[in-house]
């Protein structure tokens, strides 16, 4: 399966194919001339796939060096970025060389940020290995790192030269790691794809059913994001729809401590809680919050967070990129498969969260 991200300046393809990882070297060679490549990954994925990917690249004439860091959201910071810069400099990486991001969302976000800022930008590709990365973070060109004050507050827009997705690698994920990716999948069904929502409604929510339907789930999710990114690359309008659940979700991730609540879990919590707020304000139809919550629970996703530290969440919301003065732009779902943007006063958000 192939999806074309037809951007005006940096078009690229998303390849979705079981077993595709075996041919990663040939795929990269179809994009770049043989050169030096920095393979950026985390310590967990390195043990699973890095040597296979390195060998595949070397067999196509690339010189490969490997940089890894401790897995997890807690590593997605400027300290790790500086270590990566130092590694690239010591290994003589130039602007004619490239980066292969091999891993989940943390790896992709960090490697993309490094690629877009090292020497003012070098080429990179995404080879995502988690469901969250395959359906969401590897596509669209958003890169970034966290600070103690806010998630993804430091970042760039930088498109990869390509995305290679092998659904087979999902089999090596732990149950929690696989299920958290369904938070983003549920989001796509809600904001733009009622057929995807129907598919999710029809399957039983087990790990087996997710893996059995993985190609369709990934393809439909990627297609939603592809369409939206092509229409609005730099988040001036409809791309904000992709943030459904993320406003409160990011605040939950930050206040819990990065890594304690996984990203997809936080998105599920965020979708349910913002829907609860919007339903009370009569911005969403009665009963839709229950539908969203039931879908999330079916897949084993959380819909609430305890302890619900409202003061800390409120502070995090005021630092959100979507905050404007005393209000914050939020995404709501007036009906399944349709999204809209609404401005909610921050003080109202706090009052609703307290209830």
UniProtKB/Swiss-Prot annotation:
One of its GO terms (biological process) is aromatic amino acid family biosynthetic process. Keywords: Amino-acid biosynthesis, Aromatic amino acid biosynthesis, Cobalt, Cytoplasm, Lyase, Metal-binding, NAD, Nucleotide-binding, Zinc. Its main location: cytoplasm. Its EC number is 4.2.3.4. Gene3D superfamilies: 3.40.50.1970, Dehydroquinate synthase-like - alpha domain. Catalyzes the conversion of 3-deoxy-D-arabino-heptulosonate 7-phosphate (DAHP) to dehydroquinate (DHQ). This is 3-dehydroquinate synthase.
